[in-house]
Amino acid sequence: MNTNPCGGIVFLTLIAGRKQKEALVHALSEAGGRLINVVYGKGSVKAGYLKDMLGLIPEENKIVVTCLLAGDKTEGVFDMLVTKFHFDKPNTGIAFTIRVDKLSV
């Protein structure tokens, strides 16, 4: 039984290289992503911190993509991010979801 009043909606956030913007937005749209938003970003954390704590190397040109997604499509989207965009490899991208419990429209 689904007890989420929003019907299992999640807020997807991902960070990837700017060169992947068009392909990512198209793939998310095809996968059912709604209200897709793209913000250009530049990291400000010191490179040593990222390397020591997470094993990551910072890059200059990034995008932050957010969208709403039906919860039952989450696994498919994460699988697509791994197979098509190689998010399972270091320094390619990071993605996570947050469950939406309430939504005002």
Which role does the model predict for each range below?
Residues 1-105:
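Positively charged, small/polar-rich N-terminal and surface patches that mediate targeting and assembly
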